[in-house]
Swiss-Prot record:
The importin beta binding domain (IBB domain), which is sufficient for binding importin beta and essential for nuclear protein import confers import only, but not re-export out of the nucleus. This is Importin subunit alpha-5. The gene is kpna1. Residues 2-57 form the IBB domain. It comes from the Eukaryota.
Length: 522
């Protein structure tokens, strides 16, 4: 049995007539929280360096030395060698530790930490007289920081943040890149370390590296690092940091590399996942047009975050939503509703649900751009998660649309798939569907076509489904279904009400004029 608070929350979601568009959008943001959470499988938070070729990191002399097979060192030997004070021994043992940590399967991160090697590895980061040792230590620490939060914490507690930030400006590009990689892992752990990096002034040296001379692979790492600095929202990144990073992200949005575009779009999605003020700073960069272009990309890794970003933007004000409409979002959404990936269908429907929460002129633009038919198709045969978002789109549309707009949706066949979904187990979605049906009946009442709609609902098997909900476990569902039946389907009483004369201005009228009735026939 739901608690009073749950019931109140459901009632708020059910009763949305009379709410303004901002309230409708805000409610949708809360309901689709699972859409808004950063999904760990969509963009990688942390990465281990397991595959750099040795010839990139060793001097020719060291390569010659490594060509002779030597048995791997034990952890005890590594600890002794790293603490020996002998440069050659330090390097050999640090490299052995790095190799252990770079194993693809079960790297012994905790063993290295418990052996007390992190302070020594951090110390080696400042050995500017030995760039190979610096690099090996940086690589080892990068891989430890790619682990759990506790493992990342051990790297931070060892003093690695200032040491790595100073290495961003290293004259050796491979060391600088490894430092960025390590810092990206630290930032990816969460808002605490993200803000620690920002407070240590990591952004200026990082942005200085975004230039045409930076190799592509390195630029990818920098972009990923920047996206991690934009990530997380408890708390959000400081606005001062956002304003520093945004111009460079805007520049990177025009790159032609798919990995850079993907990470930049993810960064934009994090920055727009917040208050209207945060959405506004992104919209004001003028980047919305480019985001819409990227929604046409054949690459899923680009479509997903660009769609997410635009979806976030249309949770904002009517003006912010209009910026997305003016940039052409309504032209690309029909094809995304039919995308082969259900996750894209779901996000597209979510975006539409927020546009549908807008004023009637924005709803009219949805109609003009041909969104109703693919939306009904999705409601009919889409993946269930996508169908749930489509249900929200229909309910918001019928809440804020004009009578004529509601009729157009009904004429597109929305009733049958909507009624069919009343048999699902998700109480929240059933309430939203009943809300949409109630909204459609209100439109029919205004046209004097309530009786026709009753017959249509009955022919589609809807009455039977609504009646069945009177035995539903959820009392909110039961009450909503009962209210519909009592108001519109109570047998002879309903017929009597339908035949009662209606008081017009000058006389009694039984129904609206025929012309109007034909124009808006259900």
């Amino acid at each position: 049995m739901p608690t009073t608070n749950e019931a109140d929350e459901r009632m708020r979601k059910f009763k949305n007539k009379g709410k303004d568009t901002a309230e409708l959008r805000r409610r949708r943001v809360e309901v689709s929280v699972e859409l808004r959470k950063a999904k760990k499988d969509e963009q990688i938070l942390k990465r281990r360096n397991v595959c750099l070729p040795e010839e990139l990191i060793l001097s020719p002399e060291k390569n010659a030395m490594q060509s002779v097979q030597v048995p791997p060192l034990s952890l005890e030997e590594i600890v002794q060698g790293m603490n020996s004070g002998d440069p050659e021994n330090e390097l050999r043992c640090t490299q052995a530790a790095r190799k252990m940590l770079s194993r693809e399967r079960n790297p012994p991160l905790n063993d290295i930490i418990e052996a007390g090697l992190i302070p020594k590895l951090v110390e080696f980061l400042s050995r500017h007289d030995n760039s190979t040792l610096q690099f090996e230590a940086a690589w080892a620490l990068t891989n430890i920081a790619s682990g759990t939060s506790d493992q990342t914490k051990s790297v931070v507690d060892g003093g690695a943040i200032p040491a790595f930030i100073s290495l961003i400006s290293s004259p050796h590009l491979h060391i600088s890149e490894q430092a960025v990689w390590a810092l990206g892992n630290i930032a990816g752990d969460g808002p605490l370390y993200r803000d620690a990096l920002i407070n240590c002034n990591v952004i200026p040296p990082l942005l200085a590296l975004v230039n045409p001379q930076t190799p592509l692979g390195y630029l990818r790492n920098i972009t990923w690092m920047l996206s991690n600095l934009c990530r997380n929202k408890n708390p959000y990144p400081p606005m001062s940091a956002v304003l520093q990073i945004l111009p460079v992200l805007t520049q990177l949005m025009h790159h032609d590399d798919k990995d850079i575009l993907s990470d930049t779009c993810w960064a934009m999605s994090y920055l727009t996942d917040g208050s209207n003020d945060r959405i506004d700073v992104v919209v004001k960069t003028g980047i919305v047009d480019r985001l819409i272009q990227l929604m046409y990309s054949p690459e899923l890794s680009i479509v997903t975050p660009s769609l997410r970003t635009v979806g976030n933007i249309v949770t904002g004000t009517d003006k912010q939503t209009q910026a997305a409409i003016d940039a052409g979002v309504l032209s690309v959404l029909p094809q995304l509703l039919r995308h082969q990936k259900p996750s894209i269908q779901k996000e597209a429907a979510w975006a539409i649900s927020n546009i549908a929460a807008g004023p009637a002129p924005q709803i009219q633009q949805m109609i003009t751009c041909g969104l109703l038919s693919p939306l009904v198709d999705l409601l009919n045969k889409g993946d269930f998660k996508a169908q749930k978002e489509a249900v929200w789109a229909v309910t918001n549309y019928t809440s804020g649309g004009t009578v004529e707009q509601v009729v157009q949706l009904v004429q597109c066949g929305v009733l049958e798939p909507l009624l069919n979904l009343l048999t699902i187990k998700d109480s929240k979605t059933i309430l939203v569907i009943l809300d949409a049906i109630s909204n459609i009946f209100l439109a029919a009442e205004k046209l004097g076509e309530q009786e026709k709609l009753c017959l249509l609902v009955e022919e589609l098997g809807g009455l039977e489904k609504i009646e069945a909900l009177q035995t539903h476990d959820n009392h909110m569902v039961y009450h909503a279904a009962l209210a519909l039946i009592e108001k519109y389907f109570s047998g002879e009483e309903a017929d009597d009400i339908a035949l009662e004369p209606e008081m017009g201005k000058d006389a009694y009228t039984f129904q609206v004029p025929n012309m109007q009735k034909e124009s808006f026939n259900f």
